[in-house]
Amino acid sequence: MSAPPVDGTDLTGELPTPATGSLAARQAELVAALVAGGPPPPGFAPAPLAAARAALLRKRAGEVARHWPLLAAGLGPRWPAAFVEWAADRPNLGGLRDGWELARALHTRHALPALGAEELAAREATHRYDGTTAPRHRRWPAIGRADRAVAVQLAGRVRLLRSAR
């Protein structure tokens, strides 16, 4: 088997036309339609594409739930729908960062459940996350807050402070 040509032609030696585009461009359109909410590329039926997109979002919700189990448990049966609504037009940042962004978004909207607030407070106390780069462990004592939950990190240990009810 020979290596693919490097001069822009396809395996048959034909240059891509504006109608067909290069293979890489067509693949990019398909990926954008599946994971970034882009329009269906030419030649793809919208219904199967929507089904594949929904399956990928459910898989992504499961990955986030593994990293943020209290957030998912706090939302209960609303978890899949809440995640899909939030993630539909956002790129995949990985389970940890997606969960962090979702928890912060719910906190901003005052829709974060108590379990999710406790988990977010603990993460904010133990890690530094600016929303653009990967979270990093904090080395110094820190406090994380979310709604009524307060977490204190000292010497690598986290204590969750709960108010008396």
Model-derived segments and spans:
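Long, compositionally biased intrinsically disordered regulatory segments in eukaryotic proteins
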Residues: 1-165
